[in-house]
């Protein structure tokens, strides 16, 4: 509230009003006890307007300083409920006894003592305020006599006006939490009456006319400026104190350089958990062969190897290629090291250089009784040097690929798993409709075994005659024995081994040497050679031929997902990308197509789009037009015959 004569109130309400204005934190026990006589005299003097507004303001400031000294002094907190009921009533204070302070109660003299005039002397302000107990501007003052903290030796000069804050004379920093923090000193200073300013000539007194007031000491620098609502317009803002240091933040400790935090240790422990321990036995995808050669030993020569494989020195113990090791040691894959006690099973032993029944047994001998010209022809024309084919390159046929791995590839790569008289299979027959992918599977087997691939066609062998065909056939088996491991792929097997009652002269002439080669080239003394025969007419083979092939698998037509995969690969080579709806419609319209027929469909669509280099991009309409020209060749009757023959003679998968 503003302390002006217009808003004067009874003096018995001053302590409560003063507490409301100055602070909201102190308890009622912090109130200063005023003598009843002095309070009545102040009430009388203020009610009869015997003192000016400035004198009343100065008196209030003086008592505020004394009040601050009481708040800053240590005291014994009284018990709760130690005040009488009269202390909560509006009127004179009814506390039973005065509260203790650092000094005895300040005696109040009569307000009229030392005041020669009243507030009516506006022009002679010097004589009217000669006995004012208020500190004048620029007055040096001595220290408090009872200052226990040891204040400064010299008092600072006070700036004119009332914009600065005041602290208690006996102020001393508290080391403990004995007292709550005192209210800001700026709040204890009431605003001056309206119209008052520090530069007004009415209250500009020379400093030499005032004597030093005893009992007052130098004050520390004033605190920061009070909030905006407590600053009176026209008063200068006090000099702010430096900002206090920010509190110490107690965050998480920072790890030293090179040290691992707790979180990283937890992550490391999680990585080495059960999931990491079983990573060693996880099923890895197929990997490309290493650059320094295939993982399966081969003859040491510099000639071209099938499927792009280089020669390896014989007898080198390495891991299997592809998903069976990929030519990369297991230690490089980051698996943890295990002791023998952690692995109760027994690992496959490494392949010996030349075990009995092993697949990779190089002979190193020049074939005898073989025409050198035929051998040169087979070496230059029949050795396949195409790119390697992985399992993922064969669309669909999941069950068939799994059966080939378990029953053919793994036994050949681990011959010690078949001890004694047991020998891994050396011949396999793949039958099914034309274009189903039988030759592609034969190339994939050569890639998985890391073997040289020699390709023969029955029609090519039967065309020049029986004698020439037999000579080429013997040269092919001799070349395969000289290049272990080797895969001899004979397609169109029905042209070489027709049924006995068909009466085909050429076929009958080649049947005897072929059966002899199968018995000799795949017998006990011809290790390292795998013969893969393919046919689209399995019913044309006689019983003797069926017995020569220990494994017989049916290669069916691709299903819908496999057809979609084949079409996507073929159309990507033509620069055509169909939408999902168009691709689904095309897959539905190619029911019964083989893989080869799907490739012919894409070629026909590209031919209808224009000349090579000038054609527009393929569209779905071009493929629809090509569907009218290309269709499936295998009939339902033929497909049923394949299924029946597989049930009777197939190995099953």
Swiss-Prot record:
Binding site for ATP: 395, 435-440
Protein name per Swiss-Prot or TrEMBL: Fidgetin-like protein 2
Protein family according to the UniProt entry: Belongs to the AAA ATPase family.
Protein function: Microtubule-severing enzyme that negatively regulates cell migration and wound healing. In migrating cells, targets dynamic microtubules (MTs) at the leading edge and severs them, thereby suppressing motility. Microtubule severing releases ARHGEF2 which activates RHOA, which in turn regulates focal ahesion turnover via focal adhesion kinase, as opposed to F-actin polymerization, to suppress cell motility. Negative regulator of axon regeneration that suppresses axonal growth by selectively severing dynamic MTs in the distal axon shaft and growth cone.
InterPro entries: AAA+_ATPase, ATPase_AAA_core, Fidgetin_ATPase, MT-severing_AAA_ATPase, P-loop_NTPase
Ranges annotated as biased composition (Gly residues): 119-129
Chemical reaction(s) catalysed: ATP + H2O = ADP + phosphate + H(+)
Compositionally biased tracts (Pro residues): 97-107, 219-240
Composition bias type Polar residues, residue spans: 10-27
Gene responsible for this protein: FIGNL2
Enzyme Commission (EC) number: 3.6.4.-
Taxonomy of the source species: Eukaryota, Metazoa, Chordata, Craniata, Vertebrata
Species this chain originates from: Homo sapiens (Human)
Cofactors (names): Mg(2+)
Entry's Gene Ontology cellular component terms: cell cortex; cell leading edge
Main EC class the enzyme belongs to: hydrolase
Molecular function terms, GO-annotated: ATP binding; ATP hydrolysis activity; microtubule severing ATPase activity
Compartment(s) where it occurs, according to its Swiss-Prot or TrEMBL record: Cytoplasm, Cell cortex
Region (Disordered): 1-36, 86-129, 216-240
Pfam families attached to this UniProt entry: AAA (PF00004)
């Amino acid at each position: 509230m503003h302390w002006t004569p217009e808003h004067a109130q009874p003096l018995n309400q001053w302590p409560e009003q003063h507490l409301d204005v100055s602070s909201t934190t102190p308890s009622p026990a912090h109130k200063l006890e005023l003598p009843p006589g002095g309070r009545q005299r102040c009430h009388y003097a203020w009610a009869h307007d015997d003192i000016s507004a400035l004198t009343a303001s100065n008196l209030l400031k003086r008592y505020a300083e004394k009040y601050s000294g009481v708040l800053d002094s240590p005291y014994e907190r009284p018990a709760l409920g130690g005040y009488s009921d009269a202390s909560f009533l509006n009127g004179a204070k009814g506390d039973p006894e005065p509260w203790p302070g650092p000094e005895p109660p300040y005696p109040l003299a009569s307000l009229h003592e030392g005041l020669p005039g009243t507030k009516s002397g506006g022009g002679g302000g010097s004589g009217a305020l000669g006995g004012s107990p208020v500190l004048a501007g620029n007055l040096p003052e001595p220290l408090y006599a009872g200052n226990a903290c040891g204040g400064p030796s010299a008092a600072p000069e006070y700036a004119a006006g009332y914009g600065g804050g005041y602290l208690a004379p006996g102020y001393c920093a508290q080391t403990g939490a004995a007292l709550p923090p005192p209210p800001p000193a700026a709040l204890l200073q009431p605003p001056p009456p309206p119209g008052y300013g520090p530069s007004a000539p009415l209250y500009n007194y020379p400093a030499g006319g005032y004597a030093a007031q005893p009992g007052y000491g130098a004050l520390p620098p004033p605190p920061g400026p009070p909030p905006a609502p407590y600053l009176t317009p026209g008063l200068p803002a006090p000099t702010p104190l430096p900002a206090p240091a920010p509190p110490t933040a107690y965050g998480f400790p920072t790890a030293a350089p090179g040290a691992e935090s707790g979180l990283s240790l937890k992550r490391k422990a999680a990585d080495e958990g059960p999931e990491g321990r079983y990573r060693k036995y996880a099923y890895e995808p197929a990997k490309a062969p290493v650059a320094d050669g295939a993982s399966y030993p081969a003859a040491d020569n510099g000639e071209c190897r099938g499927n792009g494989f280089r020669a390896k020195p014989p007898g080198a113990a390495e891991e299997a290629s592809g998903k069976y090791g990929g030519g990369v040691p297991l230690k490089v894959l980051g698996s943890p090291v295990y002791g023998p006690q952690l692995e109760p099973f027994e690992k496959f032993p490494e392949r010996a250089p030349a075990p009995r029944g092993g697949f990779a047994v190089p002979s190193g001998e020049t074939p005898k009784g073989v025409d050198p010209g035929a051998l040169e022809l087979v070496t230059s024309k029949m050795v396949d040097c195409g790119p390697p084919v992985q399992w993922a390159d064969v669309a669909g046929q999941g069950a068939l690929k799994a059966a080939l791995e378990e029953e053919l590839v793994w036994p050949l790569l681990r011959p010690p798993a078949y001890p004694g008289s047991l020998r891994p299979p050396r011949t396999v027959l793949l039958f099914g409709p034309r274009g189903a992918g039988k030759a592609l599977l034969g190339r994939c087997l050569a890639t998985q075994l890391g073997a040289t691939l020699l390709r023969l066609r029955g029609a090519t062998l039967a065309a020049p005659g029986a004698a020439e065909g037999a000579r080429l056939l013997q040269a092919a088996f001799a070349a395969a024995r000289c290049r272990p491991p080797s895969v001899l792929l004979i397609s169109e097997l029905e042209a070489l081994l027709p049924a006995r009652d068909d009466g085909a002269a050429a076929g009958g002439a080649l049947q005897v040497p072929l059966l002899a080669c199968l018995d000799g080239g795949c017998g006990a003394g011809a290790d390292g050679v795998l013969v893969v025969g393919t046919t689209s007419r399995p019913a044309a083979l006689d019983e003797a031929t069926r017995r020569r092939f220990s494994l017989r698998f049916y290669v069916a037509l691709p299903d819908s997902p496999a057809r979609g995969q084949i079409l996507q690969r073929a159309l990507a080579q033509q620069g055509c990308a169909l939408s999902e709806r168009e691709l689904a419609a095309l897959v539905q319209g190619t029911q019964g197509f083989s893989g080869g027929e799907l490739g012919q469909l894409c070629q026909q669509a590209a031919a209808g789009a224009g000349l090579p280099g000038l054609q527009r991009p393929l569209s779905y309409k071009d493929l629809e037009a090509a569907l009218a020209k290309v269709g499936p060749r295998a009939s339902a009757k033929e497909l049923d015959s394949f299924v029946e023959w597989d049930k009777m003679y197939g190995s099953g998968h």
